[in-house]
């Protein structure tokens, strides 16, 4: 700790004004003394000899004249082996250990180390004495679950160093010295398996930043096919309350084709975090065959926890994600919900008496949101390997109003927009991603022409539906009515997905391509019916057959039989296919 001390001069909610003597810096951590407790706080503004601190605890009992001590360190997290499978709060306190120490009701001023000081890790050296290393270079390895965890030179060491000592292979604790390095001035530095890094400072220990192009497979048809996300990309899921944002994120976290998932639950209901904690240990990661919890880190600040630490939780989550990216891994960060984070910013901005922007959010809201999403990306490390951080954030606009500031600021910086619709969720069309309002800048797992052909039916079908509401079904031509039925068919059998069915909840890319080719045959078929009732009955029967087909295990006997039945049904009504659709299908097959 530094020798800088201060005393409380004013208290306003969870913001404390402190008069100090000495040197302090923005985002530095300080502790406010209240009786026997020390409340953690962060400097958010410095003016002359007075600083404003946001306290990460309830400030009940804090009074003018209380002592404040400053640490000289920025708000930071501990990085090292043992992060996977943990549940932290926004300040990286392990919540299960906190519960053991103080019970289920959190006490103020209790902080525990993020990484276990007693656990031992099998260390295998990667460098030899005499080699030169820089920050981010690998010193050795230790197994962490199914991953090969890299022990790296701390990111804050900006010089080039010579290795003068490296431990032999064996078991060590996280704070045992595993290497010593010498800088250009001849000073030696001891290195351990763990180090600290400020949460609001992006990690730049890489050779090159690349453009995200490789699709991130989520196993959700509507996302992978129509509104894809790339590894290292960004996307947002805005939607009204109860539209299915959290369920969609949970499905993504279970099935996404990534190595590590970081869930930052900032300001959401505690029940949703509890659901994750109950489900994930029992679920199997299809890539490794191990428990899903072994690849997951949860950073949760629920709505019942102090508001200030919500802001810290998203930064804590993205810093942990960047750490695993430096190991050449693909990481997915899910922030639920960024609206609560923005509300925490608004609350603190109001207490600082700053000039408010739209809806009382701070004027710098857009730059804060942009700086957060810019920490996503694909990078090429110095070793030549690639790592990525993909950020997906939910937005909870009041009343589902997408024109509010948080949604608009997010739309300017993300690469994909998965807008959830109240109309679709009320109709139980899940996932309730609106097929016309949503968009993506990333390449799909399917052929672009096939996707465009399907979207044309969704768009034209919606136009016909609007027309039918005015003139009725009788005033609609058979040609338009068939376009409407084909659009509804595509929606019901491909866009909608049953997240509670063991088969339909996760659809591999090979199956998506195979099934979409059959859907294309339906969309491109030239059909003739005597009446609209016959057309409706035909598509109703075909839709039910396809929904049963979706629930058959991929390449199983039931799957093959159901596909034969569907193809025979299609052949019975029409063998002629539109030339454009036929060309696309031939290219897909």
Curated annotation (Swiss-Prot):
The keyword Zinc does not apply. GO terms for molecular function: ATP binding; proton-transporting ATP synthase activity, rotational mechanism; proton-transporting ATPase activity, rotational mechanism. CDD domains: ATP-synt_F1_V1_A1_AB_FliI_N, V_A-ATPase_A. Its EC number is 7.1.2.2. It catalyses: ATP + H2O + 4 H(+)(in) = ADP + phosphate + 5 H(+)(out). Keywords: ATP synthesis, ATP-binding, Hydrogen ion transport, Ion transport, Nucleotide-binding, Translocase, Transport. HAMAP family: ATP_synth_A_arch. Belongs to the ATPase alpha/beta chains family. Produces ATP from ADP in the presence of a proton gradient across the membrane. The V-type alpha chain is a catalytic subunit. This is V-type ATP synthase alpha chain 1. It comes from Treponema pallidum (strain Nichols). The gene is atpA1.
């Amino acid at each position: 700790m530094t020798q800088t001390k201060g005393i409380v001069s004013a208290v306003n909610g969870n913001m404390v004004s402190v008069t100090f003597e000495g040197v302090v810096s923005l985002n530095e951590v300080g502790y406010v003394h209240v009786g026997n407790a020390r409340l953690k706080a962060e400097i958010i503004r410095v003016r002359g000899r007075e600083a404003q601190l946001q306290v990460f605890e309830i400030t009940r009992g804090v009074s003018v004249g209380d002592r404040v001590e400053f640490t000289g360190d920025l708000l930071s997290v501990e990085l090292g082996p043992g992060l996977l499978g943990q549940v932290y709060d926004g300040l990286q306190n392990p919540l299960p250990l906190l519960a053991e120490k103080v019970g289920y009701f959190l006490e103020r001023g209790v902080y525990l180390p993020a990484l276990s000081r007693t656990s031992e890790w099998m260390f295998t050296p990667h460098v030899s004495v005499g080699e030169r290393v820089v920050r981010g270079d690998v010193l050795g390895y230790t197994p962490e679950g199914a991953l090969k965890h890299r022990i790296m030179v701390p990111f804050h060491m900006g010089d080039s160093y010579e290795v003068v000592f490296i431990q032999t292979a064996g078991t060590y604790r996280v704070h045992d010295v595993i290497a010593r390095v010498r800088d250009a001035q001849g000073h030696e530095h001891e290195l351990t398996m763990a180090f600290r890094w400020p949460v609001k400072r992006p990690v730049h220990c890489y050779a090159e930043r690349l453009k995200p192009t490789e699709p991130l497979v989520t196993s959700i048809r509507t996302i992978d096919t129509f509104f894809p996300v790339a590894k290292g990309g960004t996307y947002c899921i805005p939607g009204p309350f109860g539209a299915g944002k959290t369920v969609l994120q949970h499905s993504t976290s279970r099935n996404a084709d990534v190595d590590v998932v970081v869930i930052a639950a900032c300001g959401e209901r505690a029940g949703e975090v509890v659901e994750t904690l109950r489900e994930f240990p029992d679920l199997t990661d299809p890539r490794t065959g191990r428990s899903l919890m072994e690849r997951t880190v949860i950073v949760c600040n629920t709505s019942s926890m102090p508001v200030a630490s919500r802001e810290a939780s998203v930064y804590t989550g993205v810093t942990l994600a960047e750490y695993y990216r430096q190991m050449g891994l693909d990481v997915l960060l899910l922030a639920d919900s960024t609206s609560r984070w923005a509300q925490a910013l608004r609350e603190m901005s109001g207490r600082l008496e700053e000039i408010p922007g739209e809806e009382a959010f701070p004027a710098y809201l857009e730059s804060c949101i942009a700086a957060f999403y810019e920490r996503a990306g694909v990078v090429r490390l110095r070793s030549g390997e690639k790592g990525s951080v993909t950020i997906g954030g939910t937005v909870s606009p009041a009343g589902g109003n997408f024109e509010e500031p948080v949604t608009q600021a997010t739309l300017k910086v993300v690469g994909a927009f998965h807008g959830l619709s109240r109309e679709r969720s009320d109709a139980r069309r899940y996932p309730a991603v609106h097929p016309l309002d949503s968009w993506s800048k990333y390449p799909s797992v399917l052929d672009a022409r096939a996707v465009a052909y399907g979207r044309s039916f969704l768009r034209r079908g919606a136009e016909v539906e609007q027309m039918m509401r005015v003139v009725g079904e009788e005033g609609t031509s058979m040609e338009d009515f068939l376009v409407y039925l084909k659009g509804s068919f595509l929606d019901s059998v491909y866009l909608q997905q049953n997240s509670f069915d063991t088969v339909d909840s996760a659809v591999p890319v090979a199956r998506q391509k195979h099934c979409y080719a059959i859907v294309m045959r339906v969309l491109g078929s030239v059909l003739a019916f005597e009446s609209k009732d016959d057309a409706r009955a035909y598509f109703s029967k075909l839709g039910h057959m396809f929904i049963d087909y979706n629930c058959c295990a991929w390449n199983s006997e039931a799957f093959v039989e159901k596909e034969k039945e569907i193809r025979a049904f299609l052949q019975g009504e029409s063998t002629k296919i539109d030339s454009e659709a036929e060309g696309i299908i031939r290219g897909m097959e």
